[in-house]
Amino acid sequence: MNNGRVKIVGPTLSRRSFFGRATAATAMAAAAGCDPLRLGLATSDGPRLRVGVLSDIHMLRQKDAMKGEIWFEKALRWYDELKADAVLLCGDIADCGLVAELEYAAEIWYKVFPGGKRSDGEPIEQLFHLGDHDFGGFAHKYPWAAKCSTDPDAVNHALVNEDIGAIWRRLFNEEWAPIQVKEVKGYKFVLAHHPRNMSKGTAIPGLAEALAAANPDPSKPFFYSMHRPVHGTLPGWSGKSLENDVNHKALAKYPNVLAFFGHAHQNCADELCLWQGEYTAVNVPSTSYCCTRGGRENSFSCANNPDKKRPQQMDRVDCMTSNQALFTTVYDDRIVIARRDVRHDASMGPDWTIPLPSPDGSCSEMERAAIALPPEFPEGAKATVSERKGKNRARQEVDQVVVTFPPAHSRDGRPRALDYEVVASAKGFKLVRRVFSTRAYWAEGEEREQSCCVFGRSELPEGKIVTFTVRPANSYGLAGAPLPPVRFP
């Protein structure tokens, strides 16, 4: 096992010396998530490296029992079937930061990979690092900590109060360091544990020096992972300034780095979970549960709600049955990332393909959005409108108007809808809402239920006919053709 010691590096390469130019076909493949093989482009002979990538498994000790093992184990067995060379786990292993929770994760790891070997006897490398939950829980008095254990002395068994080096050696048979460097089949991985005493913030102390000391080969990709993401790489946060982010500044010197971030629990069906700027980054989904972008009537939280003073009319979408993971395959000329619905053993969308050497910005939001197609409803699809008595998210009983519609799945080269724009209009009145579908975080073959958007009756004008139109939108906000309008009352 690598002990985290690294060498001093020479000068770094410029961005343009690494990135090349792409054909239009490759750019379209990157936007649509298509494998260039299908487009007849030149490819390497075979995979050089296979890595399972997952995050936020949240092993949980609750009432002296452990939870969280089902989907973690299932993801590991999928990686075993695909003959992964390594598994990268991007933090939040222990939900409440308890030693017992980390021990449980190690137990499951060795259950699937006894002696650190796959079922075919070949070795597999564990590339684990800690997140804020691992060093949080009781230590930072998070409100969810009370659920973690009935043991009043549980804080004394928290990782933050223990010798993490001794625990890491005991569980994973390797030395622990705040930033560890490993090499798998000639490819380097720089793994940054979440800082022990950081309850807020993202800065990794010593990151720039560690990246330089790792001395990555400029002619091939290398990999970096930390738990909390660079905010400007998050879906819905792409416009946030990166200029003062110390992690971003350190990574921006290496156009050949592929960074994996956890923490955000974003739906990997969202194309913006793949980001490219000065380097390339992936926001890794949670194998435990999903969160969503804000700003939708049924967003996971009220964050980014355009009108925070108004109670949302819908409960948050049920993301607790979302269990996702990724699988990364490295070739000489490309990296391919498969997106997985672990619960249903199905794809969450077309594979992402990152050409090597990567074109200048071809995987950026701007480039992919420019060539992305809008989703479309199936032919003959219709919306309906009804009235009911219900409760808004503030649990207030209100009269509501419900617009119901079918999901817009991928077809004819068009993508699955990420969300839906529902417009209520009347003379002198217009109200726009956005919603996620009921099962947006499941593989689309499992998304069979009707979805809806709920309006408060008091939000609509009295004495006027209100017309509702529904349009499906892709990850970049581009909406397709609307369903035939429906009127109320």
Residue ranges and their predicted role:
Residues 460-477:
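Beta-strand-rich modules
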Residues 1-14:
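N-terminal secretory signal peptides
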Residues 54-55, 87-92, 125-132, 224-227, ...:
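Active-site neighborhood of phospho(di)ester-bond hydrolases with catalytic His/Asp-centered motifs
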Residues 99-212, 216-217, 246-253, 269-315, ...:
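Extended active-site neighborhood of metal-dependent phosphoesterases/phosphodiesterases
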Residues 45, 307-426, 430-435:
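A short C-terminal boundary segment appended to hydrolase-like catalytic domains
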Residues 477-489:
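Extracellular fibronectin type III
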